[in-house]
Structure formats: C-alpha cells, structure tokens
C-alpha cells in the first residue's frame, strides 16, 4: 500500500497537446460495432502487464485460458522475457512462443505503463514494441494484431516517472505504428479518460496508487472491447492440441538490450512493483514471483 503523502501530481499537463486525430486513422482505429459478445472475448488472447494480469487473477473478465499478464513487464521485454508456463513443459516460454502454441484468432496487447520514463522517447518505445509484436506475428502469422492504448493514470499517482503527458505521447505514436504496420489500434483510453481533465475517470484507478484499473474501469474496458470488435475470416491452419496456460512469471526488474537512437537505455522503474513481493533469480537478470491458477 502506498502512503497518500507519497502520491505525486503532474504540473503543466495539457490534455489537448497529444490528441489523436481519429479522422486521420480511420482504417486503423477500431470503430464502434455491434456487441460481439463473450464469444469474442473467449477467442481473443490478452497479453500485457499487471492490468492484464488483474483481468483474470483478481477479476473474472478472462481466465488463464485466454490471458497472459506479467506484473512489471514492459513492451521492450515482449520478444525475450520467458514468463509463460504451459502444460506441455515445465520451462517458461516467451509470450510469442505461447501465442504459437495457444493459436488464438487475435491478440490484444496492452503494454507501455512500465516503459514510461522521462528519458525514454516515444520513437524508441514504439521501435522496441514493434520489434516485440513482430516476434508474435513471426511465431503465428495467422493471428490478428490489436494494440490497445496505454490506460490513463490518475491525477495523483505513486510513481514520479509517470506522466499523463507521456502516456498521451506514447499512445499517439502507437496509432502511427499500427497504421504503418497494418495492425489495428483499440483506442480504449477514450472510455477510461475524464474528458474534462484528460486523466483517468474518478473511480477507475486504485486510490492507493493511481495506476491500476479498478473493477469499474474493467467493466467499461470490456464493454468497449466487445463494442469495438475486429472479426476477420478465420484463416488459421487446422488447430493442433492446445496446451493449458498454467503459470506466469512476474517481472520486477528485467534488463534487455534496447533498440535506441535518441534515448537513454536506462530501464524504467516498474510502476507495478508495489504489487509484488521481491524475490531474486539468477536467470536472465530477472527478479520474479510465480503465479498459478487457483485449483478448482
């Protein structure tokens, strides 16, 4: 739990500065659709950080069958961090390798909160994120790629490295990346943001940290996902036996090489570390804890 005295605020935030011109990205940003229902959620694989982990570990919006979340994980780790355990092996695999085994129709990726850092520019963020997504596509070419916006933070939050200004900058860069690569952008931030302030709506982030999404926010998010659906012809090859997702590895600190031309290679401090218990591992410079499904 974070003491309220340690909460920080951002000065000089201009909510209009990095507004996404939705008219310029009509073929990329998912438009409102009829409600695609729970079946759409069930056939989607959610990949992300702690807000994705909360979808199935804390709440019941998805399950271990269709979601993989690693607390503290950043987009730059997507290609290399072995954080997924499947029933076919005792070893951990990367999310990309897991996608190839789980064979979903589509993936929705939600990363970026743990990349936020004043020294890490948007251009370098998307360069590394794109490289990670490309490993997903290479592992399972039939999958549809939907990149979700980074959720807004509260006006008061617990990590001084985070600003809503940079969240907006990153999201604007993500739309451009998706348009260039032919991927779809799920602009869910528009339903999570308070239009008057540009920050998360009241009650949509935990008061203890101003970062993690609450059940109310998840309700709004999943309604948005179902009503901004992307359903294409199912061109997957004949499915092979699909293993069970049996466990996750949560990253506290994970250092990887960064593709960078303009930014420092300093690893951002995880905005999620207060939610995990520190333990150490000699493997791949990772401190982690493991999460497994609750036995039925």
Can you say where each PLM-predicted feature lies in the sequence?
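Active-site segments of SGNH/GDSL-like serine hydrolases
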Residues: 110-114, 136-168, 190
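Conserved SGNH/GDSL esterase-like catalytic core that processes O-acyl groups on lipids
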Residues: 34-127
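Non-catalytic propeptide/linker segments at domain boundaries
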Residues: 2-38
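Charged helix-capping and loop-helix junction motifs
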Residues: 122-132, 167-170
């Amino acid at each position: 739990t974070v003491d309220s005295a340690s909460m920080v605020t951002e000065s000089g935030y201009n909510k209009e500065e990095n507004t996404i011109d939705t008219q310029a990205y009509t073929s990329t940003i998912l438009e409102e659709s009829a409600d695609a229902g729970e079946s759409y959620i069930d056939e989607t694989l959610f990949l992300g950080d702690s807000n994705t982990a909360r979808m199935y570990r804390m709440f019941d919006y998805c399950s271990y069958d269709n979601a993989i979340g690693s607390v503290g994980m950043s987009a730059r780790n997507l290609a290399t961090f072995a954080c997924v355990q499947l029933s076919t092996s005792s070893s951990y695999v990367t999310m990309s390798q897991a996608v190839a085994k789980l064979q979903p129709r589509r993936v929705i990726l939600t990363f970026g909160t743990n990349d936020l850092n004043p020294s890490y520019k948007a251009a370098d963020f998307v360069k590394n994120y794109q490289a990670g997504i490309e490993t997903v596509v290479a592992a399972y070419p039939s999958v549809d790629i939907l990149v979700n916006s980074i959720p807004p933070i509260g006006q008061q939050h617990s990590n001084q490295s985070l600003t809503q200004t940079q969240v907006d900058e990153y999201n604007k860069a993500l739309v451009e990346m998706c348009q260039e690569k032919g991927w779809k952008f799920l602009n869910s931030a528009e339903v999570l943001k308070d239009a008057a302030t540009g920050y998360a709506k009241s009650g949509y982030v935990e008061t203890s940290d101003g970062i993690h999404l609450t059940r109310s926010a998840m309700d709004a998010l999943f309604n948005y996902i179902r009503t901004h659906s992307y359903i294409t012809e199912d061109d997957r090859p004949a499915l092979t036996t699909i293993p069970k997702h049996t466990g996750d590895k949560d990253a506290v600190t994970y250092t990887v090489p960064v593709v960078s031309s303009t930014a420092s290679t300093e690893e951002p401090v995880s905005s999620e570390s207060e939610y995990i218990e520190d333990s150490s591992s000699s493997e791949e410079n990772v401190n982690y804890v493991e999460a497994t499904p609750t036995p039925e």
